[in-house]
Amino acid sequence: MNQSPSLIEQGISQQHLKTLSCANVLTLAYQSLGVIYGDLSTSPLYVYKTTFSGKLSLHEDDEEIFGVFSFIFWTFTLIALFKYVFIVLSADDNGEGGTFALYSLLCRYAKLSILPNHQEMDEKLSTYATGSPGETRQSAAVKSFFEKHPKSQKCLLLFVLLGTCMAIGDSVLTPTISVLSAVSGVKLKIPNLHENYVVIIACIILVAIFSVQRYGTHRVAFIFAPISTAWLLSISSIGVYNTIKWNPRIVSALSPVYMYKFLRSTGVEGWVSLGGVVLSITGVETMFADLGHFSSLSIKVAFSFFVYPCLILAYMGEAAFLSKHHEDIQQSFYKAIPEPVFWPVFIVATFAAVVGSQAVISATFSIISQCCALDCFPRVKIIHTSSKIHGQIYIPEVNWMLMCLCLAVTIGLRDTNMMGHAYGLAVTSVMLVTTCLMTLVMTIVWKQRIITVLAFVVFFGSIELLYFSSCVYKVPEGGWIPILLSLTFMAVMYIWNYGTTKKHEFDVENKVSMDRIVSLGPSIGMVRVPGIGLVYSNLVTGVPAVFGHFVTNLPAFHKILVFVCVKSVQVPYVGEEERFVISRVGPKEYGMFRSVVRYGYRDVPREMYDFESRLVSAIVEFVETEPGLEEEEMSSVRRKKEECMEIMEAKEAGVAYILGHSYAKAKQSSSVLKKLAVNVVFAFMSTNCRGTDVVLNVPHTSLLEVGMVYYV
């Protein structure tokens, strides 16, 4: 079955997918296997190996193996199936999922906007709906807390960014551990192959994966679902074979009693080993994050009726094999494969690792794009890799950065056990962030009773804290990697957000007053030249300081002036009919307008987007529908037509883009830490990141930059 581009586009660009036919749901469910479940399905490659990598030993009674499988089964059932499939997938934001979707819901319902240019008119967007106005005592109390303590809003943002940074850490560790685990199976057939060659092969595959990203996944995505399907069917069939051949009694380990027996007999070592068990649910967060690419029902169908049983059978079969082959624990996955099908399964495993890596890389591009929309990451070039499928993007800087980090981890560690320890900490951290945000969503958005909310957070939170504590114990053995990565990204995000916020505050404090503009008269104190001048700023009201700086140094300006503010709003997408908000600046004879251009946090301006024509059309429509005096209706209509003609003639004369090239500097009275953050770190990022003109796709032939210094 081939993937249908029209269905994928529908899955990505439309939020109301509940009316899909049964055939369409099944088609989307099949497609999701190659996009969502690549990471989750490759976990059997390293779960048992990592779990038994410490001091946990095997005894003849097999109580440890039965206990570990019991933990895997119930963790998979409670966290992946009950929490994510049955509960978390319901917390969508207009069909979109992920950490930012939860945060967006909270911001809208609790009015926690951290965007400095938020306007009341944004709340009238069709996707901004906040449901019924009714409040419960709990939801009102939480909202009141955030209103009375503004710093708590910043803390919530930092908490969300923490989860985001850990997710980025996942994107470094997933390709590394998946590819290296898959390739290491070759040593079983070629025992004399040196470990260095295995690492080199893994590095070559990783370089190949990142090198083809610029071409877009849509060119090869049609084979992703068949690969994942073949992989899941292979490992589940082998699992059934091993269960029947080696130890059918493993079925009894489905009882939770074996978890208790395991912890009782192994003690501290058993608790420490749980950091390996949690790797069985790596990738469950992807189900929620990629919700906007498919439908909630299709993801639930794919997981509940195919992915879940296939993986449980695979883990069961490997446990049955291990119960009779204690000495093969460090190569249990490949040792459990029957000899006649070893090489076919090895090849499929390698391709499955590539598919799993591709899924998290694409998800990282989406995460970084959303961070940029919230002013929480330096400007990067975002490229659409498909003209048909919305949401498939490529970010060159992030791609090569991830490749370098993956290669560094692969070459530096060379040990999938240490990688597993690092991976576990990243996974449990993201899950805990989701649980905490879901608790707030259940209180503020869903308005659930306090007993329901407490039951959710206590039950799932305690399970995840158990695994988290186990992973924290292994920080010296590889767990430091995601901590280092997340702290680095957190510092970058926070400093960038701090710097841009301070620059906006400077803009607000130093904007040019309308009295000054009006005092200049109709000519605005200068020669008006043909054409349209687009003055970009972050202000939604007032005249930006960059304009005052410009008119002070240049005695000419365009006949039509448009102050353009491109901003993000706390919804995933903004419809084209709602994108432009046009208003006048000053009297009509001045020919000055303001255009607020709104994008959702998942919207990305396309390279071929005809911005000029759409903007001019929006201005003309505004002029035509602008209310006038009834007694002068005829003359008003004539003046409107004349003004529209002037605007169109100005467009034909040419459009110039005026952007401020700003330099932020800390005030002399600032602390040493602030000077370091602003004058050194923020300045370095501003200098080396993409320019505003690149991000906004401004044509270089029409660009005019005005230098300004911001003292923050």
From Swiss-Prot:
Extracellular side: 41-67, 176-189, 241-267, 322-340, 414-424, 471-474
Plastid keyword on record: no
Transmembrane segments: 20-40, 68-88, 155-175, 190-210, 220-240, 268-288, 301-321, 341-361, 393-413, 425-445, 450-470, 475-495
GO cellular component: plasma membrane
One Pfam family per UniProt: K_trans
Annotated compartments: Cell membrane
GO molecular function: potassium ion transmembrane transporter activity
Cytoplasmic topological domain residue ranges: 1-19, 89-154, 211-219, 289-300, 362-392, 446-449, 496-712
Tissue: Detected in the whole mature plant but preferentially expressed in roots and stems, and in potassium-starved plants.
Domain of life where this protein originates: Eukaryota
Note: Low-affinity activity is strongly inhibited by barium or cesium.
Function: High-affinity potassium transporter that could play a major role in the uptake of potassium from the rhizosphere. May act as a low-affinity potassium transporter under high potassium concentrations. Could also transport rubidium.
Family indicated by similarity: Belongs to the HAK/KUP transporter (TC 2.A.72.3) family.
Name assigned to this protein: Potassium transporter 1
Species annotation: Arabidopsis thaliana
